[in-house]
Amino acid sequence: MESPRVEESYDKMSELKAFDDTKAGVKGLVDSGITKVPQIFVLPPKDRAKKCETHFVFPVIDLQGIDEDPIKHKEIVDKVRDASEKWGFFQVVNHGIPTSVLDRTLQGTRQFFEQDNEVKKQYYTRDTAKKVVYTSNLDLYKSSVPAASWRDTIFCYMAPNPPSLQEFPTPCGESLIDFSKDVKKLGFTLLELLSEGLGLDRSYLKDYMDCFHLFCSCNYYPPCPQPELTMGTIQHTDIGFVTILLQDDMGGLQVLHQNHWVDVPPTPGSLVVNIGDFLQLLSNDKYLSVEHRAISNNVGSRMSITCFFGESPYQSSKLYGPITELLSEDNPPKYRATTVKDHTSYLHNRGLDGTSALSRYKI
């Protein structure tokens, strides 16, 4: 059977605006009973999901006993280093965040997205100056983006100056605040392990940042009538130092490994960790910031919460380049230095276009 054809001519901007003006997001489209994916969500054939490879074993790292046994600690450092060099991704279990906190956070955010559209509309905005933003496709109007993504999102800036409880939608504020406190501790632990994996002092990466920044993206992926035509999130790399992802049991996250797309299994109680662009740059390609994506499905909705750790683009003008201690005659710098603000501005202006931004800093 032939794939549905994309119409050659249509007023894309008008359709984007009509979708945006509903303030109901993708969930609103699904609730209206659509049976076909609107044109603005249809990806070019080359960007659509292909068959996934299943023979790879995704790395899982047990953090149990990390601070109690020096031998166990070294084993964990070695596993983190190996996964960061070969995959740029790994799962962690026994990470210290109670399952009850994870479940409550997923339930609270899901409850918000599954409210009546009229209730949600009051929170819908594209004003990124706000600390909490509910919207669909923040890069909706970017010309470089091949198609809108099949998801709705709550963005929230959780550090250094987190929102008050009153700034959050009622169902999810308290759980997100509690979760962000726990995930911040885990993030610092991971930065310590990653520092040691590079042969640096444990506190090196944590101390390297002028102003720590934690940004959370709560993504709701409704069921899609034609999942083969669109994507929950198109392939991309992450901007910061480290990303920690909490996902429900629906699955859908895929990682590019050895030129194959690999499913990341939704293991109960686990969190997914991946290396960001800035850590690949700082490590001079020792650690990898790897392309990943979220595919759409036609049965059930998916909920995920992504936490981005890095330097604040608003409060630091520090130049970041490959770490001097890692360089040598045999390992010269592969990137020119840049600021987080410059990199963030570039990505925000470009949107998710399916390519890595690191190439613009290559020497």
Swiss-Prot record:
UniProt-annotated binding residues for Fe cation: 236, 238, 292
Annotated GO biological process: coumarin biosynthetic process; ethylene biosynthetic process; fruit ripening; response to molecule of fungal origin
Keywords: Ethylene biosynthesis, Fruit ripening, Iron, Metal-binding, Oxidoreductase, Vitamin C
GO molecular function: 2-oxoglutarate-dependent dioxygenase activity; L-ascorbic acid binding; metal ion binding
Signal peptide extent: none
Domain of life where this protein originates: Eukaryota
Family per record: Belongs to the iron/ascorbate-dependent oxidoreductase family.
Name of this protein: 1-aminocyclopropane-1-carboxylate oxidase homolog
Species of the source: Solanum lycopersicum (Tomato)
Taxonomic lineage of the native organism: Eukaryota, Viridiplantae, Streptophyta, Embryophyta, Tracheophyta
